[in-house]
């Protein structure tokens, strides 16, 4: 429970001028050798009605003086206890240190606030469970190189490796450089791994400096393969500045390297090096095929095509194979706009296994007439697509029937034509045709040698007690003229019953 005095001390923001020094002291708002203390907002204090300083700076000063009473007042005003501990460490007031430290039990959050190496060490010693390795790790994180220099001989090989990696990840360039130049590190090459992980070209540059200027161990055995690997990594990540930094020390941007840029669609990397390298036609073609397989953007595909002058004769079949295998149409659209039409060859493959929704989008994207889609669906035995595309053209079954009949006349594919006729007959079954329309449909079947459908519609007409003798005679003439033996036999059989 707070006393009334503490509540007043915590919340008072204004001291009347008429208050005497004695009253201020009795209120606990007096700082010996400094004067009265007054809270200004949440972050500042006013000393002796004259000097305004941050509350945490006042805490550090009070801690350095060992003034527990002022420290407690400032903590009441929501100052940061860490600054009080720092001040107490600077003034070697260990009883105050212990009193304050017991409230937090962890020194590591204080360390980033400390600038002085000696105070840094003393603060870390407050945690009796920590060792030298822990001290050095935190020193590295907080740019205390001098502490690392002091304790380097007391670190094991594993500790040194951990400290080096910490310096790299914390991007403490001076410490990374000093360690690379002065301490034997088990795996110094980790600097490159971390540089790529953080995408930090400064670390990469330091790694190369250590490798080439100081010949640090374990890194100079196969420099060519190391540089090649770095170029591939950088190309795959789109890090052009990494590639340029690496090339200062050697290496070459090969097709393997450019393939990584293509695979991950890094057009700027590609553009930069394609402008500066004279690649063979075959290499450019391979990069284009890889870009298709990787589903690269239009800009990347256009870039590669531009270096091929949009000439794809040598790889036409391979492009179609890639489009089919990876179900991508971007390249087809780009070439189509350049008057290079690959739609026909790929349409049959796509319509053979893709859904109606997909094919509708494909049709709209490339402005394909529904008639072509229906005929191709018939060739590929996709009755479901025939029904859906024709329904999209005409909603009414009768209209669809007449529309499909018109397509049969121009359909050359035998099995496709048969499927269209089969679909037409199913539509007929769902319609209510007048006898005249049924006669016309029977003649249509006769013209196209659709024996089964012809027999079916004649049977339907007979059930309606409609005389079909003249129809059979007319259709017989058609069958004889077109030389349809099976249809001739069927008609003659039907005529025998009339």
From Swiss-Prot:
InterPro entries: MGF_505. Induction: Expressed in the early phase of the viral replicative cycle. The keyword Transit peptide does not apply. Keywords: Early protein. The keyword Plastid does not apply. Plays a role in virus cell tropism, and may be required for efficient virus replication in macrophages. Belongs to the asfivirus MGF 505 family. This is Protein MGF 505-5R.
């Amino acid at each position: 429970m707070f006393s009334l005095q503490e509540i007043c001390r915590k919340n008072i923001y204004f001291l009347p001028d008429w208050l005497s020094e004695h009253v201020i002291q009795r209120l606990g708002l007096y700082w010996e050798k400094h004067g009265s203390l007054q809270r200004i907002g949440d972050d500042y204090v006013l000393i002796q009605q004259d000097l305004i300083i941050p509350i945490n700076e006042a805490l550090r000063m009070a801690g350095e003086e060992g003034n527990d009473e002022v420290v407690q007042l400032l903590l009441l005003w929501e100052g940061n206890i860490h600054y009080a501990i720092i001040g107490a460490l600077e003034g070697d007031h260990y009883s105050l240190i212990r009193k304050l430290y017991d409230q937090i039990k962890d020194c590591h959050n204080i360390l980033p606030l400390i600038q002085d190496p000696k105070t840094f060490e003393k603060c870390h010693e407050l945690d009796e469970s920590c060792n030298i390795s822990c001290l050095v790790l935190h020193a590295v994180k907080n740019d205390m190189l001098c502490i690392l220099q002091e304790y380097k001989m007391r670190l094991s090989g594993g500790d040194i490796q951990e400290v080096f990696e910490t310096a790299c990840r914390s991007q403490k360039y001076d410490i990374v450089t000093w360690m690379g130049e002065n301490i034997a590190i088990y795996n110094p090459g980790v600097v490159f791994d971390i540089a790529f992980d953080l995408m930090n070209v400064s670390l990469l540059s330091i790694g190369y400096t250590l490798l080439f200027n100081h010949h640090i161990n374990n890194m100079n055995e196969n420099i060519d393969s190391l540089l090649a690997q770095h170029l591939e990594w950088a190309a795959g990540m789109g890090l052009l500045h990494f590639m340029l930094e690496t090339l200062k020390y050697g290496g070459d941007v090969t097709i393997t390297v450019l393939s990584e840029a293509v695979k991950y669609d890094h057009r700027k990397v590609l553009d930069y090096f394609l402008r500066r390298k004279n690649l063979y036609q075959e290499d450019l073609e391979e990069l284009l095929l890889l870009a298709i397989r990787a589903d690269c953007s239009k800009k990347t595909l256009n870039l590669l095509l531009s270096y091929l002058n949009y000439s794809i004769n040598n790889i036409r079949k391979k492009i179609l194979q890639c489009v089919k295998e990876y179900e991508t149409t971007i390249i087809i659209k780009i070439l189509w706009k350049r008057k290079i039409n690959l739609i026909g060859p790929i349409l049959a493959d796509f319509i053979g296994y893709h859904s109606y929704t997909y094919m509708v989008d494909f049709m709209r994207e490339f402005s394909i007439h529904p008639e072509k889609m229906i005929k191709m669906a018939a060739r590929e035995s996709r009755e479901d697509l025939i029904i859906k595309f024709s329904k999209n053209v005409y909603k009414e079954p009768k209209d669809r029937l007449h529309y499909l009949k018109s397509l049969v006349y121009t359909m050359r594919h035998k099995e496709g034509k048969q499927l269209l006729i089969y679909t037409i007959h199913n539509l007929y079954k769902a319609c209510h045709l007048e006898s005249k329309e049924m006669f016309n449909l029977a003649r249509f079947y006769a013209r196209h040698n659709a024996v089964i459908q012809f027999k079916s519609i004649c049977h339907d007409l007979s059930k309606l007690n409609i005389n079909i003798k003249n129809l059979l005679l007319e259709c017989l003439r058609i069958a004889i003229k077109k030389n349809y033996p099976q249809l001739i036999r069927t008609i003659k059989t039907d005529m025998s019953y009339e």
